[in-house]
Amino acid sequence: MPASTITVFFATNRNPIGDPPTDFGPLLGPIDGTAIRFGTAEIDEKTLKLRKLEVAPEKLVFDDPTDKTLVLGSQQVFDALKAKMIDHARDTLIYVHGFGYSFTEALVRAAEFKKWLAVQMNIFVFTWPSDGKMVPLMSYPKDRADVERSGDAMARAIEIAARYLQKIATDDRCEQRLNILAHSMGNYALRYGVQGLLRRYHSTLPRLFDKVILAAADEDADTFEFDAKLKPLAQLAQQVLVYHTPRDRALIVSDLTKGNPDRLGAGGPDNTRSLNDKVSVVDVSEALSGDDDATNHQYYRVNTRVRADLRQVFGDIVPFQVKGRLYLP
């Protein structure tokens, strides 16, 4: 594709629209949301509009007994992703979006983040069936329920990626790394993805990620204290970073109006002294002016100081040496 587009790889457990699919909707897909479709999208770099969507063909059911050729969409997409990782020596970032995104909006937001972050990496989106409506008291409970039911699908998408990479011959295996960034309710999705992996691997989780970024997390503040939440995340990653601010108005609403416990993305994690050494906590309050985002919930992509911080993180600067931070041991 021309240089004027941004390639976004995706996996989704949303309901497909059309056969073959030309879009995906706000509902759980086949097999109670456990079936996953893979594909790629091209987003116009200037206008940030979807220019092209390709859903990888998938054939798991044999209508013709004489033709039992298995077609896996994941194989096609990961072949393309692997080629980019090797040819361009780029890491890959898996992005998990938050509440209120349609399928297309999730793809565009991922491309926008890659453009604004200005780090050379591949972008891969896991897009769960958020309904694309910002109606908190109506859409929020539905999205939250769908997140819980999407955990196995997310775990399967991660497992498929890991299994595929493990099959690559040693001399072909690329040295580039996988990172993950979850925003807002995407952190709740990540919790259930981690639990899905636990059911598969039991207590011995594989190291799948280099860095995991939890931004403005709509997740419980005690999440690192329980195996049933995100405590096992440290086993999956080399480094876990929590970005938070008590000034996050969206999470204040989540806390006060929806009966949720204290939010990780607002006050940060409970009991920071007992955190795994891999977990770093970054309070972004001093970087916020309110001019970029009135809710103080989208700072990971719109705030220049936070983006500069993330660029250093992806550039392998260790936490206590990141410029612009006041380090509190």
Give the ranges of each region predicted by the language model.
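Gly/Ala-rich beta-loop-alpha elbow adjacent to hydrolase catalytic centers
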Residues: 154, 182-186, 190
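A short, well-structured juxtamembrane/interface segment
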Residues: 72-86
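Lipolytic serine-hydrolase domain surface
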Residues: 1-66, 85-87, 107-111, 117-122, ...
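Alpha/beta-hydrolase fold active-site loops
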Residues: 91
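Beta-hairpin (beta-strand-turn-beta-strand) motif
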Residues: 98-99, 128
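Active-site- or binding-pocket-proximal scaffold segments within functional domains
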Residues: 66-68, 72
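The conserved beta1-alpha1 loop
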Residues: 94-98, 183-184, 216
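Short substrate-entry loop that stabilizes the transition state in hydrolases
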Residues: 101-106
